[in-house]
Design a protein with these regions (language model features):
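Membrane-interface loop-to-helix entry segments
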Residues: 181-193, 250-255
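Early transmembrane hairpin module of multi-pass membrane proteins
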Residues: 2-4, 11-130, 143-145
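Transmembrane-helix exit/juxtamembrane "anchor" motif
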Residues: 27-41, 76-80, 125-128, 266-280, ...
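Interhelical loop segments of eukaryotic multi-pass membrane proteins
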Residues: 36-48, 78-96, 130-139, 170-178, ...
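Membrane-interface transmembrane-helix boundary segments in multi-pass integral membrane proteins
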Residues: 2-21, 106, 233-295
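Interfacial segments of alpha-helical transmembrane regions
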Residues: 134-156, 207-217
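Alpha-helical transmembrane segments in multipass membrane proteins, preferentially the mid-helix core
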Residues: 191-207, 229, 263-271
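Membrane-embedded alpha-helical transmembrane segments of multi-pass integral membrane proteins
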Residues: 67-70, 74, 116-126, 151-165, ...
Length: 306
């Protein structure tokens, strides 16, 4: 399968762009035709909880939202920056690059955590409205489930990719993986699933099968951004497999769509288990989170300093 990540005699960017365009149009048509955006849930589902006092849920969501904003600001203001091993757009070779300032917002991990923060910000505001005796706006009743679906689907993807691909793959190449174990990185690819899992169990937000369109659209927007950043801005692909010119460009992007769907369906299954039996849901969420988060120390990976 390594040949998929190689450059062939002819660039495959036209085929990849055609696939992405078709996927975008199909998803937009589905969203508009299905009416999934207009489906609202009750105020109690969006803002309340059957298992803890509403004020505790509001506080929990507020802390999560503040934590997200603080983390994103912290990584942008970190003067040490972050070393990455991207593919240079012009030379098509991998090379260490130090990301500083606003460039730290480029990784998909950060985008996913921003979606996490957006969900918790709107959900927290909705919970406080309920606690204070107000009404949750109609737009929030519609937006919160879609934001939750996007945050859950992308969080599972990020955590799994970092744990099972990025850390071991970079460690095998002799690249220092200690950056993945800094507090903000651990929060964005470990704490994300733990916090969202807790909200999934405690809150009442429902996810549906049709909402899979939103993690997919989120992924498409990021792919568009990654290409614009490589061509017009930073000159790098942080993820080598997102270069549409690769021999396996169309196949890789099709696989990515399938993977995003798979992780969303996993989140949907955990949500269904929690609704069926909260204790079963707690066990399933805890086991699922434990199985994909990174608990090993950097020194435990081959080729890393003790």
């Amino acid at each position: 399968m390594r040949w998929l990540l190689e450059y062939g005699e002819r660039d495959r960017h036209l085929e990849t762009i055609a696939l992405l365009t078709f996927a975008l149009l199909a998803l937009l048509y589905y969203v508009l035709a299905s009416g999934v955006v207009g489906v609202t849930q009750t105020q109690g589902q969006i803002a309340g909880s059957q298992y803890v006092p509403d004020i505790l849920l509001a506080l929990f969501r507020t802390v999560a939202a503040v934590l997200s904003v603080f983390t994103l600001i912290s990584i942008c203001t970190d003067e040490e920056g972050s070393l990455s091993l991207p593919t240079l757009y012009d030379s098509r070779q991998s090379e260490e690059v130090l990301l500083l300032g606003i460039h730290r917002l480029v990784p998909f991990t950060v985008w996913s955590f921003a979606a996490f923060g957006l969900y918790f910000s709107v959900a927290a505001a909705s919970s406080w409205a309920l606690v204070l005796g107000g009404e949750v706006p109609g737009w929030a009743l519609a937006a919160v489930p879609l934001a939750f679906a996007t945050a859950c689907g992308t969080a599972l993807l990020v955590t799994s990719v970092v744990t099972f691909y990025l850390i071991p793959n970079n460690a095998a190449k002799g690249y220092d993986v200690r950056k993945y174990f800094e507090w903000h990185e651990m929060l964005m690819h470990n704490g994300n699933v733990v916090i969202l899992g807790a909200d999934l169990v405690l809150g009442g937000v429902d996810m549906t099968l049709g909402m899979v369109a939103f993690p997919l659209l989120f992924g498409l927007v990021y792919i568009g951004f990654a290409n614009a950043y490589a061509v017009l801005g930073g000159g790098i692909y942080l993820y080598d497999f997102l270069d549409p010119r690769l021999r396996g460009g169309p196949a890789i992007h099709a696989i990515l769509f399938v993977v995003i769907c798979a992780f969303y369906f996993l989140a949907l299954a955990l949500d269904a288990l929690s609704e069926w039996n909260v204790l079963v849901g707690v066990v399933a969420v805890a086991a699922g989170s434990y199985s994909i988060i990174t608990l090993r120390k950097p020194s435990e990976f081959r080729g890393q300093p003790a």
